[in-house]
């Protein structure tokens, strides 16, 4: 595919590379991999990871069509489902372009926890390894599919510090700094936190401010008496901030499932989320700008 014929899919370029959408190939994401991950050694690691995982047909993971080299550019070509990257959804919500309701945010969070938990429950302790908002596709019915799973072993080979993983790739790592099921849980916690904040926290000091961000987390309208307290305890365990940390997403999922919420409110999430995803996919007109976006929500919570 000629890059001049391609359309940028993800406006938020990250340390993994640059994402493109191939208009001639259906729902195809082409990721031009960053130099750090596209060395000849890491190319072989990525190809091996693709072959290792592809044979299992894991429904949580979007299928990679191929890994190809064109001169100095290594590209990972992935078949993505209809939907919108979570990074795009949160960016739109942050700036008030769409109204991602509390019940829709909780529904996506629950779908994410369930999806990663199902992955971790499989034999052989499989991992994703690179859970960021750019690697989550949210579908109209609220289900999610994960991309970017080819990089787990390559990331391990880089020997980055926790701070470097964050600054370079936007990956929040546990104290062990190992790419494993616990790092998946920590990154899952960051995605859940981002959903309730309606933005992806950024900046070089995010790790240092996690405790403060968790303290302000709220499920909003779906909350009942103990919801927010239970949500903060869950996030604290995911981030190793207090209480026993989760060993994997199976444990995290069992605890998340016990968080009490307004069932009727969460049950209404699907039509709301369907509208938001269709708006972002160009199938419905954009709504009037939501005044204040995340800033107004934060001020309301503080008051």
Task: Report the location of each language-model feature.
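Flexible N-lobe loop architecture of eukaryotic-like protein kinase catalytic domains
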Residues: 55-61
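C-terminal lobe helix-coil module of Hanks-type protein kinase domains
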Residues: 171-290
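ATP-binding glycine-rich loop module of kinase domains
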Residues: 7-55
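Activation segment signature within eukaryotic-like protein kinase domains
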Residues: 108-109
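Short beta-strand micro-motifs within the conserved protein kinase catalytic domain, predominantly
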Residues: 63-74
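Protein kinase catalytic-loop region centered on the HRD/HxD motif
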Residues: 112-127
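Activation segment/activation loop of eukaryotic-type protein kinase catalytic domains
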Residues: 128-172
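Structural motif in protein kinase domains
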Residues: 81-93
